[in-house]
Structure formats: C-alpha cells, structure tokens
C-alpha cells in the first residue's frame, strides 16, 4: 500500500506497518512444528506490481496488496471518477480472489484510502453492490470490517485505493472446500 499523509505521529518522516506470524499455525494446520508456509499468488486478471505480490497467504489469512483502479489488460488508470475507480479496485480484488477459488465473502477486513472524504458516499454506493456477495452472506447481513483513511496523495493520482484481508478457513496451503472445518460465520448486526 502506498499513500501520502499530511502528518505522522510525533513528527515522524516515515511510518511502516508489519505483520508477523509466529509460525504455529491455526486450525486446520496447527501445529506446524514451527514451519511457516507462505503462498504467494499473482494473476494476470488484476494489475501486477513488480515490487509486491498481489496476495500472500499464511495460516488461514490472505493479505491482498492495495489495488489501484488500473485496467489489468493495459496497466493504465481507468477513465472516470471515484465511482468508476472504486468499482475497478473491487473488481481487481475479486479477480485475485477468483484466481485462488476464494469467495468474495471470505473478506474479513477492507481498508479504503481516499483523497477526499466527501467521496465516501459515492464509494459506499459502489461498495454495497459488492457486499454482501452471496445468498448466505445476505441472509445474515455479513459485511467485512472496514476502515477508511483519507490520504493526501495516492499513486498515479488515483482518487481511491482499496486493500483487503481474507480468512478463507482452509489453511495454508489451501485445502479442498469439503476438507475445511472449524470455520463458522456468525453476523451479529444489531
């Protein structure tokens, strides 16, 4: 994820985020005797960045790199405003997940980076056409956790950039759907 911010805590010049796994695994792969298996995925159906994988899976989580509103066929920014750009970001995320046979509703966290907070209403319109995605998710009104960050600048002057975290419940390496166990989705929307 690349973005510009106007100020960082304590006047820092750089802030970095890291995600670390202790390598012990989770259901269904625990214990892994300390072996940490990481699976990297790239598909030509979404934009490819030579500096990062489209997704990296470990344990039962899959972290997708933030998607810009790029046409995967050309690698260029799509035409249009924030509505079209948000739609393309989500289409790119969906293409990455489809390339791994992971349903869109397995997304547990979405981070949306906007240049202008006033665009949030338009982004929400597009967002609701993607979530919930399946009949099961609609039945329980499942939507992932979401954070919106206002950035003072995004790569290629994009208006929006979206990243996602998936918990597909099948471990790493992925297992057949019929072999999954221990994953229960309960939405508590009150």
What are these model-derived regions, one by one?
Residues 1-91, 95-109, 113-190:
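N-terminal presequence-like segments and the immediate start of the first folded domain
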């Amino acid at each position: 994820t690349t973005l510009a911010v106007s100020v960082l805590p304590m006047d820092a010049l750089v802030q970095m985020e890291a995600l670390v796994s202790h390598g012990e695994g989770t259901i269904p792969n625990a214990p892994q005797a300390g072996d940490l298996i990481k699976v990297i995925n790239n598909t030509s159906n979404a934009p490819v960045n030579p500096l990062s994988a489209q997704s990296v899976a470990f344990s039962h989580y899959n972290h997708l790199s933030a998607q810009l509103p790029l046409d995967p066929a050309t690698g260029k920014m799509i035409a249009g405003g924030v509505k079209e750009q948000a739609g393309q970001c989500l289409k790119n995320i969906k293409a990455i997940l489809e390339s791994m046979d992971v349903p869109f509703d397995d997304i547990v966290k979405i981070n949306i980076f906007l240049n202008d907070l006033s665009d949030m209403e338009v982004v929400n319109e597009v967002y609701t056409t993607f979530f919930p995605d399946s009949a099961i998710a609609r039945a329980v009104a499942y939507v992932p956790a979401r954070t919106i960050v206002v950035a003072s600048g995004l790569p290629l002057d994009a208006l929006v950039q979206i990243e996602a975290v998936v918990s597909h419940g099948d471990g790493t390496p992925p297992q057949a759907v019929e072999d999954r166990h221990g994953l229960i989705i309960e939405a508590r929307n009150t």
